[in-house]
């Protein structure tokens, strides 16, 4: 809704300039959309990080700890470290590819 007489927003062709009357609402809508996208991105990042930790814990434990006991041997510690690093490298490659694809889609 315009705060001025609608005839003052008419162009010389007699059409109203809708960008000047809807601009505040449009900007607010864009801000809400951006806020929602940011919130969703943060929630997805948290969920993905949780899934990564779960996957690393589950898979590396199963692979490296053959007989559970009170302490871990140096071999088990090294195995867990290497396993964790492998998953982190994979995570980074996949994340970079995913982010690149999302950015590419946003620019088209």
From Swiss-Prot:
Family named by the database record: Belongs to the small Tim family.
Keyword Metal-binding in annotation: yes
Low complexity composition-biased segments: 1-29
Location of the motif Twin CX3C motif: 60-83
Function noted in UniProt: Mitochondrial intermembrane chaperone that participates in the import and insertion of some multi-pass transmembrane proteins into the mitochondrial inner membrane. Also required for the transfer of beta-barrel precursors from the TOM complex to the sorting and assembly machinery (SAM complex) of the outer membrane. Acts as a chaperone-like protein that protects the hydrophobic precursors from aggregation and guide them through the mitochondrial intermembrane space.
GO cellular component: mitochondrial inner membrane; mitochondrial intermembrane space protein transporter complex
GO molecular function: metal ion binding; protein transporter activity
Gene3D superfamilies assigned to the protein according to its UniProt record, in alphabetical order: Mitochondrial import inner membrane translocase subunit tim13 like domains
Residue numbers spanned by region Disordered: 1-34
InterPro entries hit by this protein: Tim10-like, Tim10-like_dom_sf
Disulfide-bonded cysteines: 60-83, 64-79
Protein name as annotated: Mitochondrial import inner membrane translocase subunit TIM13
Main subcellular location: mitochondrion
